[in-house]
């Protein structure tokens, strides 16, 4: 888990959860370049530990679905009751067939591969802050 936060800034904080380190770091760079503070976690269990002390600072979660230890769906089921206003964006390169309940995704599912501009547009849409205009036309996953 890595923290990119600068305690002197008021940038939106995003939790990024993915077991693929290369992709996680690449997406963290994309988000950081767009002005977001990023907290990284390698699986759902690590993500739950990471958010334990954030107290309202977290604005969005981006999580892979298929991960060891605790997958993204299990993480979201544990996370949402404690943070009901924080949206969760699921990303996956495979069939998300882990769940039969479409409510698990809330319509926030982005399939890999995607471009950084598509990713940032979805982040901005979920944050509702106009961030969808950020980003460049680069493939990231």
Feature locations, PLM:
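Non-catalytic signal-transmission and effector/linker regions of two-component phosphorelay proteins
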Residues: 1-15, 21, 25-28, 52, ...
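Acidic, metal-coordinating helix/loop segments flanking the phosphotransfer/catalytic sites
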Residues: 40-60
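A Lys-centered signature of the CheY-like receiver
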Residues: 112
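Active-site residues of response regulator receiver
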Residues: 64, 92
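Receiver (REC) domain active-site loop signature in two-component systems and cognate sites
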Residues: 67
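Negatively charged, flexible loop motifs adjacent to catalytic sites
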Residues: 94-98
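Conserved phosphoryl-transfer motifs of two-component systems
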Residues: 107-109
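Acidic catalytic/metal-coordinating carboxylates
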Residues: 42-46, 70-75
